[in-house]
């Protein structure tokens, strides 16, 4: 077919122009000014934020503000990856615990030029986060401006269920026991006395401080202090709430605790100020926020971590983008906007001029929040805090699952924290092997080009002959290159480098040291064994079930179209939705799996998500469910391509069904 008109005018220039238009017409905002904000706000907070952004857009019609919600880890890792590539949002909003890492990496910039000392005086000291410059440690930089202070935990009580206020931990336990109800005697509680996200280390901090423990040594340094008698006592108390008093559901994460309290199935919840607005406005019950009680055995108050939530500026922003972004920050931290957030969400303001408002004295929630904040401890804004959380989580969750004692968990936390912090601050310098690898990469590339020179020559010749064809497949090639080939090669290079918290931008090739360290890890072989088991089991069941179902559907089965649709659903549904569904089914208290086990099989319920072996088994079952439909579709397509004459000839020759399957199928 010739690309020409009847009059001989070639259409190729027109086609090229059309393709270029289609490729670049969706390139985004071509005009105006754009500010991108990544945040971690709850739905209630987002509603208030959008209202304030609309007001800002009305005042600045030439500026477009795009606010995107990100989960905690998604924001942290996504911002790091974007910053490494020289991109990312102009602004990020969140708690101050990530700032130590971001500043050490050198991916956020000093906000002092837009907040001079005269403006800084308008804020309470805790609202402004200053950290040493990554370039000159003798100089400090303003890396976050907070629009609120606190971000702390407190106790919220459902007053329709509980009229008392616990002042001590013994009183809290007594009330929780009284409010924990199993109405039908089936062993499953319809209501709990106390719920909170006790599987995460951040939410156990009030129990640590109430027993006199802390995560770092009291000398102000960065040495962890996780293995102390006080910490063991705190973990013991949490474990007793679960196992002895049974007032909290097993594996109670944030979503479970939040849902139970909102549905009136819990009398008390420990949660942060970001959630109180939802509870106080819940039409199903009357809620009240009160300070956490005093630990009876020590007389110390349960003090949560207190942190600032605020805005930070991306180092990769251009001067013009930075100026626009800081104009937005100045608006969102203004007294007018903070009053709106304070009134609707019960947050404590960061501007000094708002601390004398009658609302702070008259509103019981704000009074309780201020009192709770006084009892709390400031969150350390250091890069090592990330290592503390990551070191606490495995042993703490193993403790809750019953595989470790409190003393063992505390000891393992301390050892892992010391190791993680040492690795974090380790500086690996390139040696001769690293320099040789750097040059060998370029030599390999040059050798590949020389080796494939004839193929490249044929490609260039074919390009001149079939430019339009290559232009059609160019978008697919670009996508494959950017999403598969480049990330793979880039990660291979990074695995040979000293890229770390201390060498985030100035990393160099050091050789195979990272691989050697992995092989030296004691856990390496256990993880390798699990990987082999995972691969073998999934492969057997994916192929086995897939082939079996494909053979059945390929035969004379009535309603095969309906069966095919039903069996393809696990593969068609997004994996994220499937994971959430199975997670709910494996829940210890309310999951369908345990309901079948206990009520129909009369066997004890299994803590699927609380123990390593059971959790691994649950993951395998979920992945089998996800994977077999794909193999079924592939096999069914192959079966339908086999000529039926082969089976007819085999039957004439007297071949059995197994022989037909083995020799033909």
Residue ranges of model-derived segments:
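Extracytoplasmic/periplasmic solute-binding protein
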Residues: 138-153, 171-223, 266
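Extracytoplasmic/periplasmic substrate-recognition and gating elements
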Residues: 137-140, 232, 240-249, 281-347, ...
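Long, aromatic- and glycine/proline-rich binding clefts that accommodate carbohydrate-like moieties
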Residues: 126-131, 342-394, 398
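Conserved C-terminal helix/tail region of periplasmic/extracytoplasmic solute-binding proteins
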Residues: 375-446
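A structural signal for short loop-to-beta-strand junctions that line the ligand-binding cleft
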Residues: 89-90, 118-161, 192-193, 298-304, ...
